[in-house]
Regions:
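Beta-rich carbohydrate-recognition and catalytic domains
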Residues: 3-4, 8, 16-66, 74-131, ...
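C-terminal regions of proteins
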Residues: 383-387
Length: 421
């Protein structure tokens, strides 16, 4: 990138250190506790699928959208706010034609929704051209209830960046586009592909190969550190994934990754990593992909491992006090984004156990994750993937999900039905 006067983008910190790039390594099933996916449909699973399909509160894409994906939502001021990305030109998930979106509607009149473009391909930012748009989320700080932070990925000139715009709930207006920052130790770079690599290398920290899209996960949990509230979540790019934290949702600090530190283990993790912090521990779940790729994202010649995905995701825990990873558990899983939620002081994982037509709920045993138990694994009778589960202001629970990449859909459900004996 050619940096301009008064540019919002900044050069990376310089370092002479040689990067350490960790390989993708197959997770041997016989070395770990395994929680298998099951296809048998229990009455509980059937009831969950029926409730989700019958209690749809609305779809939030534009009628003219031909593709939409990756939803996040929140409630404020008697409205629901939903983020996603969409393609209005073709039915492909193609960042060359995608826009980052925020939609909102009154809870008592969902059909009366407004949809705003947050960023589109072709837009000019600080003199630079947006060439691709990808993963889009929305976040809120506990001490800033009037604003929603809309974070998204864009290829600007020749590099992917994490960018944000602040949406004011009262005025329904979006602020200017600015750049998130990525901090490792004392190194602070733009939150970009090179910014991540350089900041990690500067601090002597390795990473797995990165490619294309950079993501930040949609679920925030918080922890007080030295009198300051930090919000935790996951970040990822290709095979690289890590825990990050922030006190302002603008600058994100690196915390840990499963291939580094005490208890680190080799893995084939890929893309979205669900993170939930409670009791000074970060619970962590991520899908895997059994194919080795090089630094440029190309398959390594001679690698004969499965290139069609992996049947197991990884469940582990990172102790924030001891800075140590727990031995992982392999959970039957397909290729989808997952999400944790706390309900009545119990932690649950929502994921895709069989394929993207199934939703599974796993009760996490926080004393011993190897004793975690399947609540249900439901055939949703159609496309239902990338679940995100959230409370409204009155304690009701909703789930957003993608349907065939045609709809951003949200349903209300009663959790208690599925965990009671």
């Amino acid at each position: 990138m050619n940096y301009l006067e008064n540019d919002i983008f900044t050069p990376d910190i310089s370092t002479d250190k040689t990067p350490t790039v960790y390989p993708c390594v197959k997770t041997e099933k016989n070395k770990y506790k395994v929680i298998e996916a099951v296809t048998e449909q229990t009455p509980r699973a059937i009831a969950f699928a029926n409730e989700i399909n019958e209690n749809v509160i609305g779809d939030f894409e534009r009628e003219t959208d031909k593709m939409c994906h990756v939803s996040t939502f929140c409630f404020a001021d008697n409205n629901i706010f939903v983020s996603y990305y969409a393609n209005g030109y073709s039915n492909e998930e193609n960042p060359d034609f995608q826009s980052a979106r925020i939609a909102f509607a009154p809870m008592n009149d969902i059909k009366n929704k407004t949809v705003l473009d947050v960023q589109c391909v072709g837009d000019i930012i600080s003199g630079h051209t947006v060439k691709k748009v990808y993963d889009t989320i929305l976040l809120q700080r506990d001490d800033d209830k009037d604003n929603i932070y809309v974070l998204f990925t864009a290829l600007v000139d020749d590099q992917y960046y994490r960018l944000y715009r602040i949406f004011n709930i009262k005025t329904k207006a979006l602020g200017e586009t600015l750049v998130n920052r990525f901090k490792v130790g004392n190194a602070v770079n733009d939150f970009s592909t090179s910014g991540i690599k350089t900041a990690l290398t500067y601090n002597g920290i390795g990473y797995k190969s990165m490619r294309s899209d950079i993501g930040i996960m949609q679920k925030l949990t918080s922890r007080i550190e030295n009198g300051k509230k930090y919000y935790y979540t996951g970040a990822y790019s290709g095979d690289f994934n890590c825990i990050i934290k922030s006190d302002d949702l603008l600058t994100w600090e690196y915390v840990a990754q499963p291939v580094e530190g005490k208890g680190a283990f080799p893995n084939d993790t890929l893309w979205e990593n669900a993170v939930y912090v409670t009791d000074d521990k970060a619970y962590y779940f991520i899908r895997q992909w059994e194919a080795s790729i090089d630094e440029n994202g190309n398959p390594i010649k001679g690698d004969n491992r499965n290139e069609q995905g992996c049947l197991y995701g990884i469940l582990t825990v990172y102790d924030l006090e001891k800075r140590e990873w727990t031995k992982p558990v392999l959970v039957g899983d397909s290729q989808s984004r997952s999400d944790f939620i706390m309900y009545k002081n119990e932690l649950y994982l929502f994921h895709a156990p069989i394929n993207r037509n199934h939703i599974g709920i796993l009760k996490i045993n926080r004393t011993d994750i190897e004793k975690s138990e399947v609540v249900l694994q439901a055939d949703m009778n159609g496309s239902c993937f990338y679940p995100f589960v959230q409370y409204d202001t009155e304690g009701n629970i909703y789930m957003s999900y993608t349907v065939d990449r045609k709809h951003i859909r949200i349903s209300k459900f009663t959790f208690e039905k599925y965990i009671s004996d």
